[in-house]
Amino acid sequence: IGVPDYRDEVREYLEIAVVGCDLRPGAKAPRLTELIHRAIPYPVILITRDPGGLAISLAHKRWAERQAGRIVIEDVESTGPLTKAVVDQAFIHDLSLAKQPTRSLFTLYQGWITRVQALHAARLSGAYAATDDQAVSDRRRAALDTISRLTREGATLRVKAAKEKQMNRRVDLNLQIQRLEAALVAARKDL
């Protein structure tokens, strides 16, 4: 395809593999996806199919810091099951090689990861908008991380509030939940 390979002190991308995998019903897709990414020593576009539908996952690879010659994966970015929703279809259309940055195999792979992150943002905001602007991508990634963290904290507080017997403590927990919900609204604006 004419895209130069990539080498630096952290990683080496000589090729990108596209791997397909059919998963059995009841398979633990996230764990299997991570294992496949760990097993293959170069960047992989993993397309999995299970009863829920097709999913695409990617994970940057880098040299291990303490073991020479060993490769470790960074965060696995997965689409989850793709549907016929407008944002999912916009994402699929945006995966074309012609729409990716091609300075190196690293930037090409990062372009696809950025599109997966844009899909996550679109599923929350309702509008798919991919960009290769690093500042926008970093802000989106931070907002997605914040939303994920706040959602987990909110779920934990709701469980505590449901179990709480003392009314004043329950009121305090509900106020904390309201503050988290306000922070979630603010974080969604950064998508």
What are these regions (language model features)?
Residues 133-134, 144-191:
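Alpha-helical oligomerization segments
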